[in-house]
Amino acid sequence: YTLPHRIRDGYGLSEKLIRDAYEQGCDTILTCDNGIAAAAEIDLAKQLGMTVIVTDHHEVPLHWEGDTSTAVLPAADAVVDPKRTDCAYPCKGICGAVVAWKVLWLVQRICGQPDAWKKYLAFAAFATIGDVMELRGENRTITALGLQQLRQTDNVGLQALTAASGIEPDQIRAYHIGYVIGPCINATGRLDTAKRALELLTETDTMRAQQIAQELVSL
């Protein structure tokens, strides 16, 4: 995987990221929370013979001619975005991480793992709150169920960050994600790259996770 560096890469797909992936032997690009407006970059990837799957939740760019507008989708092999004008998905206000989670959910179901989505429910709730989505409809359900899971998570990184923030696990509320824990996760991405936060969430060693959590809290 690659996490864009805020200074070197900007936000989302860039020509540099695509060429780097190609030179490393990657034949497929799967985006999360970006790509819907990266038509030129995706054209480059297709010219290089790569498969591109976009998962995003941002508005689809429009091309205007007079008073008439036409949605402009990138030439990806698949574009999953609830904001597509031809998408009948009822909850248009899900965040980008939830869009990716739902794609993963479908893939796991096809692979005979219909309940595997539950493993990532806490992260879906975390992302929904952290991205300041409106907590109505499906978002409210995801958040309510995800908070229950988060309070008893076995994710070493989340446990460490909760402890470093001085929060009792069984007391975690949406407020804590939005104003205490969430900003710690976002901080590294705002400064340069979100790599440090991802390292925390994928860490399995308790002491190492505690060290990273303390670093994030101190930012």
State what each model feature region is:
Residues 1-28, 48-49, 75, 109-219:
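Hydrophobic helix-and-loop "lid/oligomerization" segment in the mid-to-C-terminal part
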Residues 41, 46, 54, 102-106, ...:
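Contiguous hydrophobic segments
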